Curated annotation (Swiss-Prot):
Protein name: DNA gyrase subunit A
E.C. code: 5.6.2.2
Domain Topo IIA-type catalytic: residue ranges: 42-931
DOD-type homing endonuclease domain residues: 256-396
Gene Ontology molecular function, alphabetical: ATP binding; DNA binding; DNA negative supercoiling activity; endonuclease activity
The species this protein was found in: Mycobacterium leprae (strain TN)
Keywords assigned by UniProt, alphabetized: ATP-binding, Autocatalytic cleavage, Cytoplasm, DNA-binding, Isomerase, Nucleotide-binding, Protein splicing, Topoisomerase
Regulation of protein activity: DNA supercoiling is inhibited by fluoroquinolones; IC(50) 1 ug/ml for sitafloxacin.
Function: A type II topoisomerase that negatively supercoils closed circular double-stranded (ds) DNA in an ATP-dependent manner to modulate DNA topology and maintain chromosomes in an underwound state. Negative supercoiling favors strand separation, and DNA replication, transcription, recombination and repair, all of which involve strand separation. Also able to catalyze the interconversion of other topological isomers of dsDNA rings, including catenanes and knotted rings. Type II topoisomerases break and join 2 DNA strands simultaneously in an ATP-dependent manner.
Main localisation: cytoplasm
GO biological process, one term: intein-mediated protein splicing
Length: 1273
């Protein structure tokens, strides 16, 4: 250790101890680390809260911000918390309050917030403390307004002032403001629009703005500090609602004020007014006589131009100064303004002021290019701003600017606003008539409103190709022009097909708002600022026409369960940071909040990340622990893991696999893979899209979309043509990713899982504070600590109640003694000179203590009545029973556990809900079949590859000959090719024309209604481009048959063991190696001694044995051997397995068919050309189908025109091989028969279905019996 030389001193230092700096730094760092760990970053295991969360909740309770009361401004909750419990700045406190109010952050929110509390994307919550300057005008009812700083006269800095004031919200509706907040002095900024409208407020004051969000124009709140030049703010311009007749005197006073401002003068000893308009002059004189009265002089003179100028002069201003016009005395022109009394007046009074003002110094004119304009000029910048603001109160939008040096103009510069001025305000007399003539003379098609909704036209035209009817209607008109919507809204809306788009555009174009472009945001220094508390959902109010709002909060009912009975000494309290008040060390927490809502935090050298869980499941686990409190740790862990299935995130989503869950629950640490929910959809144009309806927990919605767009741009994500956010508060998350036509949906989805946060991991680290020390806990340990805490709470609560009951019983026993000796007590009290003497006497008389004696002396005379005496005796009896019950609770642990169970059951039933997050299996994990019920379903697969499964009970069993029930609605020329009943656990093998085989469990097919088409298998399986289904086979297991036989168009056949095709590869496997220009035609299951029948397109057929000697088994990656040879223009049409007592039924393109007994086909050697099965006839056409049937087999056929026939094989004439067949159906001109197939519903156990074919001429399938001929179309 280095020697230390102490500096010379004056003897005032009593003692200095040398300390090793390394040891001191180590000690200080450990102290700091533990302070952060215990005091800030980690939750307490008992209530699951960090100190700041606990303090916010307790401060809100202590301040009365409870769920049964109105919301309180968030700043009040923050101020109470910071002032009494948490002196670490308001930002962290407000962030905590906001998070506890966000339903996407907490599974069970503890704060009920109103206002803008952010979003799962990049939208931040509104700031806690935001205000506007004192001169901001707040809109009131009936056109009145008041400066916010004048609402409460003499309001103190940083004060909350109760008021009862009706203001207007963003929609122009009256709402109640019950508090004015004087927020002290703060730095302010002024937002000015290009038109000249201004609002001054703090940087965190929110204004309603029009923002482009993913190409959609959206109304969002932005802070003044976030607003930039070029942004668009929203101004409310709904004309005021007027009520009753105007006050005549006030109206005349306003008229006279407007006249003197525009055409008069008022000196200290002389006032006057003049005008060339006699009607206007007369109106002003009459107003003067009404308002002022007294002596005045009227004269006239001829001007240089020859006009008559009428003049009013007043030389005695005594009466004038008694009126509210006295403020004009000695006022310079540059200092003129609208006085407060006029702002406080209703719209009828303000209208009179504006009419007189514009009649005096206002002008209307038609400029070049048919532009009509109204203007007003003044030397006062303040007056120009006031006039512009007052016009806006009437719904008139104007521009204000400096015209020349020291001259300011207010201009109404387009026809729509001129018409609004003319209907809502108007000139006084003569000029109004001129304005009417000018408006009438203009063509209705010129001078229209230039007010548009920025970005609306682009948004509309972008969706023309897939969402709109009559695209040209939106390319030829100014659909973003508000005035165009005003005149033609019904016609425009009629062209819009999508209801969500209709809602967006109509809300923006209904005329309530004006979208003003921001010109500048400037620093306006430090000044007093104010805000209002408005008791509505969005808390909006109008200031200078801008739309402002605030956030408010109160505790949720579930948060009250966290704080329940905290006043019954259930937890320990400690002094706050300055010793003034007490705060709880932990909350009673009547439900397991740590696991229900989870927690996250980063401390020094450690971090916690506990996922949220389902309250029902947690309660079930707690109940087991209460009933089996003496179980060992291993048994308890297994039991709670059986009941708590896994995390349950507020944003739902999927958990992939259970290994990470098991790790987290068994060791306290684990990586849990989570995934969003994606559905494959196909629109009316056949385009495939991936639709994301749920995102993983804590994934930022906006950043996720941006990430996809960026990776598509850089080429990392392929196959995506468009990404669109269609989500809203109404529909929730809906991100539509449009897939390119040549892309495979499953491949794109897998890439999204790999390269984006559509699949991510939640790193569980179940670390919390236990007895002041951080510990990593297993699931069962967390639940046990919670149970121990609840047992302690019950003991402390019961002890408190027992003490209070004993105190009450003690007093009642004294009262009963007094009532038994009532006369003696009354005599003693009357004889006592002082209360103290009476108290001592009562103690000696009744043998009681001072507490009982005082209660007797405090007893009211009315309690001496007989009924009251009996009530005291009854109360004592009840309390004695209660004391015995409370004592029993303290004596019996099983009763305490029962109370916890009953109270938690009540909470879970009241606030619990179903699990949101589903757990799915992965390879090597629990099989999906363990999670899916085994049930019978109907599987439907169409010719073009659409597949679905349907519950069997949606189809009713019918007798033969019934009409059936409506089945799938299909596209033109599509038919149901495969239709069978199977178990949800059965395998379905899809063989494609390219020689590959894919498999899926029946439950993996989309479940759909009878009438739904389903989804294309290319979206369910990773089909390659151009692959089509050649055959579908259903098996329960790979032991159902020994062999699988495949046949190609070139006549090759291959027999392989069915078990060779048992593969887990999601991308399919090779079923047969195809040679050039060949494709797979058929696939059948075959026994070891079966026979095969091959039929060619030209009518040749060959039957041969499939024994191992005739057709040896081969591996999958082989081409097979020649099963049938063809002439040059022939090919294989079908592959069939021969069954006894069956027929080969063939059909031709001309609509002819026949059936031939299978015995007529001789056994031959493999590889020949076979024998003739039908005689070719040009009129009858070529062969289109050949299937093996029995007499009762049902079959159907479809034509190129969409016609369909359904009949039984018995109705088709039996004939020999070398015949042409008979007519199966009549064909229309140009129609041909496309295909025949056995009716797949034969295997559906009585299920009957009617297949719908879009645009088909025939929509009916008929069952038939032996006495019915086939129906023809």
């Amino acid at each position: 250790m280095t020697d230390i030389t102490l500096p010379p001193g004056d003897g005032s230092i009593q003692r200095v101890e040398p300390v090793d700096i390394q040891q001191e730094m180590q000690r200080s760092y450990i102290d700091y680390a533990m302070s952060v760990i215990v005091g800030r970053a980690l939750p307490e295991v008992r209530d699951g809260l960090k100190p700041v969360h606990r303090r916010v909740l307790y401060a809100m309770l202590d301040s009365g911000f409870r769920p049964d009361r109105s919301h309180a401004k968030s700043a009040r909750s923050v101020a109470e918390t910071m002032g009494n419990y948490h002196p670490h700045g308001d930002a962290s406190i407000y962030d905590t309050l906001v998070r506890m109010a966000q339903p996407w952050s907490l599974r069970y929110p503890l704060v009920d917030g109103q206002g803008n509390f952010g979003s799962p994307g990049n939208d931040p919550p509104a700031a806690m403390r935001y205000c506007v300057s004192g001169n901001s005008l707040v809109r009131l009812l009936f056109g009145k307004s008041i400066r916010i700083g004048d609402i409460v006269t003499g309001a103190q800095f940083n004060s909350d002032n109760p008021i009862d004031l009706k203001v207007l919200d963003r929609h122009g509706n009256p709402v109640v403001a019950d508090y004015l907040f004087h927020s002290g002095e703060h730095q302010t900024y002024t937002v000015r629009t290009t038109e000249g409208y201004e609002i001054t407020g703090t940087s965190n004051h929110p204004l309603l703005c029009l923002v482009n969000v993913g190409g959609i124009p959206t109304l969002l709140w932005k802070l003044i500090g976030e607003i930039r030049s070029g942004d668009y703010v929203v101004l409310q311009r709904i004309p005021p609602v007027e009520f009753g007749p105007a006050d005549w005197y006030s109206t005349m006073e306003a008229l006279l004020f407007g006249a003197f401002i525009s055409g008069g003068f008022v000196f200290q000893d002389h006032a006057g007014f003049n005008s060339l308009d006699r009607d206007y002059f007369t109106m002003v004189v009459n107003a003067y006589d009404t308002v002022v009265g007294g002596l005045r002089c009227i004269s006239s003179r001829i001007t240089v131009s020859g006009s008559t100028l009428l003049e009013l002069d007043v030389y005695n201003l005594i009466e004038f100064k008694k009126t509210r016009l006295s403020g004009l005395c000695g006022q310079r022109s540059a200092d003129k303004l609208v006085p407060d009394w006029l702002w406080h007046s209703p719209s009828t009074v303000k209208r009179a002021f504006l009419q007189a003002l514009f009649e005096g110094e206002g002008f209307s004119s038609i400029l070049s290019r048919n532009i009509i304009e109204i203007s007003y000029s003044t030397l006062s910048e303040r007056l120009a701003a006031d006039v512009q603001q007052m016009l806006l109160e009437f719904g008139v939008v104007s521009e204000r600017y400096c015209h020349t040096v020291n001259e300011y103009k207010v201009v109404i510069a387009n026809r729509a606003q001129v018409e609004m001025f003319f209907t809502q305000v108007g000139f006084g007399v003569t000029k109004q008539a001129k304005l009417i003539r000018d408006v009438v003379s203009m063509s209705p098609c010129v001078g229209m409103d230039i007010n548009c909704v920025p970005g609306l036209a682009t948004f509309i035209r972008k969706h023309c190709d897939n969402r709109w009817v009559e695209e040209d209607s939106f390319n030829q008109h100014n659909v973003d022009c508000v005035q165009h919507w005003h005149h033609h809204s019904a016609e425009i809306v009629g062209h819009i097909a999508d209801p969500d788009i209709r809602a967006i555009v109509t809300d923006l174009t209904d005329g309530r708002f004006y979208y003003a472009r921001v010109a500048s945001v400037t620093d306006t220094g430090i000044q007093p600022v104010f805000s209002l508390h408005v008791d509505t959902e969005d808390h909006s109010f109008l200031t200078n026409g801008f739309i402002s709002h605030n956030t408010e909060a109160r505790l949720t009912p579930l948060a009250m369960e966290m704080l329940r009975e905290i006043d019954e000494e259930t937890v320990d309290f400690i002094s706050n940071y300055d010793g003034r008040v007490q705060e709880p060390m932990v909350l009673p927490s009547r439900f397991p909040n740590l696991l229900a809502n989870g927690s996250g935090g980063i401390a020094v050298g450690m971090a916690t990340n506990i996922p949220p869980h389902n309250l029902y499941e947690l309660a079930d686990a707690v109940f087991w622990c209460l009933e089996n409190h003496d179980a060992d740790e291993e048994t308890m862990l297994v039991a709670v893991m059986e009941r708590v299935k896994g995390p349950d995130f507020p944003t739902a989503g999927l958990i992939v696999g259970s290994q990470g869950i098991a790790d987290a629950y068994k060791t306290g640490r684990g990586s849990i893979r989570i995934r969003g929910v994606v559905e494959v959809e196909e629109d009316s144009r056949g385009r495939t899209s991936l639709v994301i309806t749920e995102l993983p927990y804590q994934v930022n919605h906006d950043n996720f979309i941006t990430s996809i767009a960026e990776q598509v741009r850089t080429g990392r994500l392929a196959g995506i043509s468009n990404v669109e956010d269609q989500g809203s508060d109404r529909v929730g998350v809906r991100i539509v990713i449009e897939i390119k036509r040549d892309a495979v949906a499953k491949v794109v989805l897998n890439n999204l899982y790999k390269h984006t946060q559509l699949q991510t991991s939640f790193g569980a680290n179940m670390l919390s504070i236990v007895d002041g020390v951080p510990r990593t806990l297993r699931l069962d340990q967390m639940i046990c600590y919670y149970v121990e805490h609840q047992l302690d709470v019950i003991v402390r609560r019961t002890t408190y109640r027992l003490r209070k009951a004993n105190e009450r019983a003690h007093i009642l026993r004294g009262l009963v003694k007094a009532l038994d000796a009532l006369d003696e007590v009354i005599t003693l009290i009357r004889a006592s000179q002082t209360v103290d003497i009476a108290r001592v006497g009562v103690v000696e008389l009744l043998d009681i203590d001072d507490i009982q004696a005082q209660a007797i002396l405090d007893m009211q005379l009315r309690r001496l009545a007989a009924l009251e005496r009996q009530r005291i005796i009854d109360d004592l009896a009840k309390i004695e029973v209660e004391i015995a019950d409370l004592g029993d609770i303290l004596a019996k642990p099983e009763r305490r556990r029962g109370i916890i169970r009953n109270e938690l059951t009540e909470i879970a039933e009241k606030y619990g809900d179903d699990r949101r997050t589903r757990i799915i299996a992965v390879d090597g994990d629990v099989n999906d079949e363990d999670l899916i019920a085994r049930e019978e379903v109907v599987v439907t697969i169409t010719e073009t590859g659409y597949a679905k499964r349907t519950k069997t009970d949606l189809y009713r069993s019918q007798k033969r000959g019934g009409k059936g029930v409506q089945g799938a609605g299909l596209k033109q020329d599509d038919i149901v090719r495969h239709f069978f009943v199977c178990s949800t656990h059965d395998w379905i093998l899809f063989f494609t024309t390219q020689g590959r085989v894919y498999r899926a469990k029946a439950y993996e097919l989309p479940e759909a209604s009878r009438t739904a088409r389903g989804q294309h298998v290319a979206n369910l399986l990773a089909f390659q481009p151009e692959e089509r289904i050649a055959q579908v086979i259903q098996i329960r297991s790979y032991e159902d048959a020994p062999y699988l036989v495949l046949a190609t168009r070139a006549g090759l056949v291959k027999k392989s063991k069915l078990t060779d095709f048992d593969s887990n590869r999601s991308g399919g496997i090779v079923a047969i190696n195809l040679r050039d220009n060949d494709e797979l035609v058929g696939a059948v299951l075959c026994a070891a001694d079966g026979d095969l029948l091959l039929v060619s397109a030209n009518g040749q057929s060959i039957r041969f044995s499939a024994t191992d000697e005739a057709l040896r088994p081969m591996g999958r990656a082989t081409s097979g051997v020649q099963g049938m040879r063809f002439n040059a223009d022939d090919r294989l049409l079908s592959l069939n397995v021969v069954r006894e007592d069956t027929y080969l039924l063939v059909a031709t393109s001309g609509g002819y068919a026949k059936r031939t007994s299978i015995e007529e086909y001789p056994m031959q050697g493999r590889g020949g050309k076979g024998v003739l099965t039908v005689m070719y006839d040009r009129r009858r056409g070529s062969l289109v189908g050949a299937i093996v049937v029995d007499e009762d087999s049902e079959l159907y056929a479809i034509t190129s025109g969409g016609g369909v026939i359904r009949t039984t094989a018995r109705q088709v004439r039996q004939a020999g091989r070398q015949t042409k067949g008979v007519r199966l159906m009549n064909l229309g001109e140009g129609d041909t028969l496309l295909a025949i197939a056995r009716n797949a519903e034969e295997s559906a156990d009585g299920v009957s279905v009617k297949v719908m074919i879009s645009r088909s001429r025939v929509l009916s399938f008929f069952g038939s019996d032996s006495n019915t001929s086939p129906d023809r179309t």
